[in-house]
Amino acid sequence: MILLKLYLTLAAILCQSRGTTSLDLDDLMTTNPEIQNEIINKHNDLRRTVDPPAKNMLKMSWDNTIAESAKRAALRCNQNEHTPVSGRTIGGVVCGENYFMSSNLRTWSFGIQSWFDERNYFKFGFGPTRAGVMVGHYTQVVWYKSYKMGCAINLCPN
C-alpha cells in the first residue's frame, strides 16, 4: 500500500504594519527544528480531534525532501495557482498542498488552525455543508493516510 504524503506550504504574503507584530520572518523559518516541531505537533494535535475519530490516523513527521518542494512552491509567490502535479510528485506519490497568505506575520499554529477551522463547513461522509465554502485545506490536514510533511515560508513582494 502506498501511503500518501502531505505537502503543506505556508506561502505568506507579508506587508508588516509598524508596531503590529513582534514576529520576525527568521522566527518562522522551517530550517529551525523548533519550528518543524511546532508544525508537526499542531497537525498531530488537531488530527487527534477529528469527529468522528479516525480508526487508523497516521502520525505526521517532518520530511526534508517535501520541505524543499514546499520551499520551491513558496518562492513562486503565486497566490492563485497550485503547483502543477509534476512539481508535487515526490517518490512517485502526488502530494497535496495548502497555502496560507497574510498581510502580516502569523505563527505557523495560526495558519494551520485556520485550515483546520474549515471543519465548520465540512460533514464527514457528506462533504461541504453548503456550496462555495472551502474545505480542502481541512481535508488535507486530517487525511488519515498522510504521514509526512514539509513546509516553507516566503516574503512575497506584492
Curated annotation (Swiss-Prot):
GO terms for molecular function: calcium channel regulator activity; potassium channel regulator activity; toxin activity. Disulfide bonds join C77-C156. It holds the Pfam family CAP. Expressed by the venom gland. CDD domains: CAP_CRISP. Residues 1-22 form the signal peptide. Keywords: Calcium channel impairing toxin, Disulfide bond, Ion channel impairing toxin, Neurotoxin, Potassium channel impairing toxin, Secreted, Signal, Toxin. It is found in: Secreted. Blocks ryanodine receptors, and potassium channels. This is Cysteine-rich venom protein VAR7.
